[in-house]
């Protein structure tokens, strides 16, 4: 009887350990799901709503220079700080007329006026305006779908502008950030350049969970020839 009791005691300890481990695993899964749900919602809010979009033509930066890799602009009622990955990029646009097409979230601060931050999204102003249709090929779970199109109106366009316009289409047609069904959890937007280079964006890159970290993917301000690329999208 002692022999059986001793092993019964050990069995209880093992059982308790299994229960604890199961609880920890379950807690981690719940936390991960909650994290993903929040971030999917944030991505949808960021790309879906036009209130987050900064558009401006033929404007110059203000003389107020805070850092060498940032330029400040006044866009309607918004005080906008545009950050770049390298300071030489900001120097290219300093004191020149530029067009802006970028996403921005309002800075959280106790300060007068509305302050916003963006990352890249700038091209030199060009008087040559011409509507160009760019084809967007979509593979939905490896099945090719009818192509979509976005339009741009400049000879040079930023990769950010293209990505924003493509995501808006994907949200509208495929509901890619839907939290109820979560039909999709992986996806890429690939700008396939005729030069042979690809620019790839992860549709489900969350950064640190805040808007600015999600937008830093655009800080290199990559620009491309509007007539020399198409877009490939894969979602699953």
Swiss-Prot record:
Q: Quote the SUPFAM superfamilies the UniProt record gives.
A: Bacterial enterotoxins, Superantigen toxins, C-terminal domain
Q: Where in the cell is it found?
A: Secreted
User: Pfam families given for it?
Assistant: Stap_Strp_tox_C, Stap_Strp_toxin
Q: Which domain of life is it from?
A: Bacteria
A cellular component term from Gene Ontology for this protein is: extracellular region
Is Signal tagged as a keyword? Answer: yes
Q: Name one GO molecular function term.
A: toxin activity
Keyword hit for Secreted: yes
Keywords, A to Z, come to: Secreted, Signal, Toxin, Virulence
Q: Which Gene3D superfamilies match?
A: 2.40.50.110, 3.10.20.120
Where does the protein principally reside? secreted
Q: What residue stretch is flagged as signal peptide?
A: 1-32
Which purpose does this protein serve, as stated in its record? Mitogenic for human peripheral blood lymphocytes.
Q: What else is known?
A: Binds to major histocompatibility complex class II beta chain.
Q: Which family does it belong to?
A: Belongs to the staphylococcal/streptococcal toxin family.
This chain's protein is named Exotoxin type H
Organism for this UniProt entry:
Streptococcus pyogenes
Q: Which gene encodes it?
A: speH
């Amino acid at each position: 009887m002692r022999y059986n009791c001793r092993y019964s005691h050990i069995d209880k300890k093992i059982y308790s350990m299994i229960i604890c481990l199961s609880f920890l695993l379950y807690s981690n899964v719940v936390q991960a799901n909650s994290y993903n749900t929040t971030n999917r919602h944030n991505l949808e809010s960021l790309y879906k709503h036009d209130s987050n979009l900064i558009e401006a033509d033929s404007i110059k930066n203000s003389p107020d220079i805070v850092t060498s890799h940032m330029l400040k602009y006044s866009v309607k009622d918004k005080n906008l700080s545009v950050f770049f990955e390298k300071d030489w990029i900001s120097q290219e646009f300093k004191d020149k007329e530029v067009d802006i097409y970028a996403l921005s979230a309002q800075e959280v601060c106790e300060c007068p006026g509305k302050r916003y931050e963006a990352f890249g999204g700038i091209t030199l102003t060009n008087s040559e305006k011409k509507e160009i249709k760019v084809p967007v090929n979509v593979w939905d779970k490896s099945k090719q779908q009818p192509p979509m199109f976005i339009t741009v109106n400049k000879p040079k366009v930023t990769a950010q502008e293209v990505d924003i316009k493509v995501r808006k289409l994907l949200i509208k047609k495929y509901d890619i950030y839907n939290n109820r069904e979560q039909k999709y959890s992986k996806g890429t937007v690939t700008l396939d350049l005729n030069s042979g280079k690809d620019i790839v964006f992860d549709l489900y890159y969350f950064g640190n969970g805040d808007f600015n970290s999600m937008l830093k993917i655009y800080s290199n301000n990559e620009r491309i020839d509007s007539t020399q690329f198409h877009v490939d999208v894969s979602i699953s």
